[in-house]
Curated annotation (Swiss-Prot):
NCBIfam families: PRK10917.2-3. Residues 32-120 are annotated as: Wedge domain. Residues 246-404 form the Helicase ATP-binding domain. This is ATP-dependent DNA helicase RecG. It catalyses: Couples ATP hydrolysis with the unwinding of duplex DNA by translocating in the 3'-5' direction; ATP + H2O = ADP + phosphate + H(+). PANTHER family: ATP-DEPENDENT DNA HELICASE HOMOLOG RECG, CHLOROPLASTIC (PTHR47964:SF1). A motif (DEAH box) lies at residues 353-356. Disruption phenotype: 10-fold increase in intergenomic and intragenomic recombination frequencies, no change in UV sensitivity, slightly less susceptible to ciprofloxacin, no filamentation. PROSITE patterns: HELICASE_ATP_BIND_1, HELICASE_CTER. It comes from Helicobacter pylori (strain ATCC 700392 / 26695).
Length: 623
């Protein structure tokens, strides 16, 4: 055990699985003597040096193979005196290289051969590593069938991994021929990568006692739902039921609720507050606009006996004298909540809205502030960014996850991909909608001019709109007053020129047109969020994707689909799997081998094996 720990420390990794992924060989150097004199083979030859010739910047050393009685040329480009000194006429030595044949004179050649003093083994080649030899020694001490089994690796997978890290000449030849590992070995690496990911998730699944187990507020919940002027969807009801079970538990819950744009997650948030009553709820939103929006929704829909407070950065001091008093049932705020020094012991539930907009440390800090004597508050994290089914499959055993797919009011949004020459179509529709007292947002790819991007910037394009329309507002992420600008636009504006800062959560009831410039530069998830701002209150909506590209299959497919969960699947076809991971859950924040779009069977296999092993170790597995 001590030896294993020392080896892991030397390799700067925390587990054998991590070592397998960090130090997967990127190639091999077969230092065995060549068995055949055949082009395309790499290996060691014993050669005798016959003569040397200089050709401009090329040094040719004429030699012969002592074993195969064949002449060959050793070629160095941009050679130096060092190469002359290494290869002396009349001497014999061992060299490593790849045997090739010249297309000019059919001579056998080895380009840039290396002199070998020790041979008879296969060296592993690692990416971005200095001491290859030492790392290989430590790895091969660490990796064994026994150690792999201890990590939960199945025997058939373990044998494939052993072939990767203890390769035979035949295996190396296959690797060089295919320029990659054979498919079964690649699948073994995928298995290990997903197993490593799941083990990391399991480490985060620590159970703590709930600081406060909430009462069963079934009657109060029924009254709240009955008071709403609309009917909840089946998905909303299921989410509320799952949360109700969580809140009454003596174990602190941590649940991720993922909903599509416009799925009505705000009503689920408010129902959670009702279920927590008379205990307190703390809700953190990423921006003042969203916090105010949630605050107004709470005032509108929560029962009149609820006392709701709002804490923003600007109003922090003003409200600090009476905020968090016993009478308050719900506190809604921004990151200003993280800097409040008051005792949060009475808060039974902590909610984070648009959770992906916060770092892991920020979410943890809020939870920690509301913890007491080792017991934690219940925690709900809401996100309006759907994730692919395969990623949900991997997470579901370790993170309680609820999906809200149904949309209360199906949106009527027409999405068109247009070339800049067709911009007159956009202008006509904008004029029509403004005449109806509707609103328009134009999203620019960047704030200031850039030679690298063939589109106008926000600052360059503003004058175009200001000359043609009234009530044009401009803002960006760099604007200190952006939230005030957006609020003023919501009340009295016609056109808002902005960057993607308006991507998430903001409710603009009169917004009917979204124009996105350079949409090819944005991920489909971002495009879906932007489009989701349109048609919030039953208006017919229009989303124009304005590009300089003649064709873009990705954008055309996006235009034909409104379902955020299907778009998340579509996104996998065009993005690396790692782009969908957030919060540093997987080393390097990306999967190198697993393809979330294609490897559902492997993910399901790993999950099944992992849960079976875990239940056996607890003595709870049943056949």
């Amino acid at each position: 055990m001590q030896e294993t720990d020392n080896l892991l420390k030397t390799l700067n990794v925390k587990s054998l699985l991590e070592a397998l992924l960090v130090y997967t060989p990127k190639g091999y150097k077969d230092l065995n003597l060549l068995e055949r004199f055949e082009t395309g083979l790499s290996g060691v030859l014993e050669v005798g040096i016959l003569e040397k010739r200089n050709y401009a910047k090329v040094l040719k050393i004429f030699a012969y193979s002592k074993r195969f009685y064949k002449n060959l040329e050793l070629v160095f480009f941009n050679y130096s005196a060092f190469h002359h000194s290494q290869f002396k006429t009349g001497e014999s030595l061992f060299i490593y290289g790849k045997l090739e044949q010249s297309s000019f004179n059919q001579a056998y050649i080895i380009n840039t051969p290396k002199i070998i003093t020790k041979f008879g083994k296969i060296s592993l080649i690692f990416k971005k590593v200095k001491n290859h030899k030492k790392i290989q020694e430590n790895l091969q001490k660490l990796i064994s069938l026994e150690n792999l089994k201890k990590e939960g690796v199945k025997e058939n997978i373990a044998h494939l991994l052993l072939e990767i890290f203890f390769p035979t000449p035949h295996f190396v030849k296959d690797f060089e021929t295919n320029k990659n590992f054979p498919s079964q070995h690649l699948n073994a690496l995928k298995y290990i990568e997903m197993l490593f990911y799941m083990k990391n998730l399991e480490r985060k699944k620590l159970q703590f006692g709930a600081k406060i187990a909430c009462p069963n507020n079934n009657e109060r919940l029924k009254a709240f739902i009955a008071s709403l002027p609309f009917k909840l969807t089946r998905d909303q009801q299921n989410a509320i039921k799952e949360i109700q079970n969580d809140l009454t538990s003596s174990i602190a819950c941590k649940r991720l609720i993922i909903g599509d744009v416009g799925c009505g997650k705000t009503m689920v948030i408010l129902a959670s507050m009702v279920l927590t009553y008379p205990n307190k709820t703390l809700l953190m939103a990423p921006t003042s606009i969203l916090a105010k929006q949630l605050y107004n929704e709470a005032l509108k829909f929560l029962p009149p006996y609820f006392e709701v407070e709002l804490l923003l950065g600007g109003s922090y001091k003003k409200r600090s004298n009476h905020l968090f008093e016993t009478i308050t049932h719900v506190v809604i705020g921004t990151q200003a909540l993280l800097f409040d020094k008051r005792d949060l012991n009475e808060f039974a539930l902590v909610i984070t809205d648009e959770q992906h907009r916060f770092g892991t440390k920020q979410r943890y800090q809020l939870e920690k502030m509301a913890s007491s004597k080792g017991n934690k508050p219940h925690s709900l994290q809401f996100s309006a960014t759907p994730i692919p089914r395969t990623l949900a499959l991997a997470k579901s055993a370790f993170v309680k996850t609820t999906m809200i797919r149904e949309i209360p009011y199906p949106k009527e949004i027409e999405t068109l991909v247009l070339h800049k020459r067709d911009f007159k179509i956009v202008m006509e529709k904008i004029s029509e909608e403004i005449a109806k007292n509707h609103q328009v947002i134009v999203v620019y790819p960047l704030v200031n001019e850039s030679e690298k991007i063939p589109y106008l910037s926000l600052s360059e394009g503003a004058s175009f709109w200001q000359k043609r329309f009234k009530k044009v507002y401009t803002t960006s992420g760099q604007d200190k007053n952006k939230e005030e600008v957006i609020e003023e636009f919501r009340e009295s504006g016609s056109i808002l020129l902005a960057t993607t800062l308006i991507e998430v959560g903001i409710s603009l009831p009169r917004l009917s047109v979204m124009v996105i410039l350079a949409p090819e530069r944005l991920g489909l998830a971002t495009l879906h969020q932007l489009r989701g701002r349109v048609s919030r209150n039953g208006l017919k909506g229009y989303c124009f994707l304005c590009t300089i590209q003649e064709e873009n299959e990705r954008l055309e497919k996006f235009a034909d689909e409104l379902d955020g969960f299907k778009i998340a699947e579509l996104d996998l076809e065009y993005r690396k799997s790692g782009d969908l991971l957030q919060g540093g859950e997987q080393s390097g924040n990306s999967f190198e081998y697993i393809d979330l779009a294609k490897d559902e069977n492997i993910i399901a296999e790993v999950k099944r094996d992992f849960l079976k092993a875990a239940s056996v170790s607890r003595g709870t597995f049943e056949n």
